[in-house]
């Protein structure tokens, strides 16, 4: 009986070494010294140490000494990794070179560094930012925007706040990449990217996705949320609080727990009527469906029809640089003859 009990214990120990060894190797590879050769060498060395420890478990006289050495090595690695600090002082890509922030004077919120690039292609653009004051008492609604490029399960989500007079302010939570740095989902688990609140004109952040991103192409859907205006105001102020905090205290992006969709949900916790956490928040492409099932979108239409009407690519391409871009992409699509497939068909 003791041997039967012991086998699962050794199995769990071996599994822990295997998992921690893989994690440690990846952490060194993605977040280690900036020299790629040194990153690879350190990652390989740690992986070999984990494999040698696993091998030593089969030898009674060596296992405890090897295990103790591995635990010390892993503790050193973990201490180093936890000590990595985010920074606002790097050589940033132009699209995230400026951090947005806001000043609050009662209901009057002045947002600084609103991005509004003039695009000629995804990578060819003229940078431009502006400041604008919004009257929070004139907030009219909050839209969820879902952007798909790889099937139904994964989407980039952002919010756009609608104000009287046709003003819209979009806020997209993204990685803040350095020049020459590319995004990697796996890399995003290991603290290589800072977090950024990209506050933008819809002619920038939406038109970039509908009109210029081609490899792969992206499909954009806009849904009007059904929450109260007061909840929308609290949500806007929470976004302001978070973007201001990042300006003075940077934070890391994380692929799983600190990303474009989880942070939208975290920010929504400011309202008592927030949705409970769901696996559909992690599988972000299903967030619109989750909101629909929870009564937070227009339920007078079947969801497939609501989704069809929410697709804005054709209207955005037609509107292009028009001053009333935000109004035109939201024009009713009920009579449209276009049969845009759902993200499930992408």
Spell out what each predicted region is:
Residues 2-53, 241-346:
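Activation targets extended, charge/polar-rich intrinsically disordered C-terminal tails
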Residues 104-108, 162-166, 227-232:
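A short, structured loop/turn motif at beta-sheet edges
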Residues 190-270, 276:
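Soluble catalytic domains of enzymes that build or remodel membrane lipids, polysaccharides, and related
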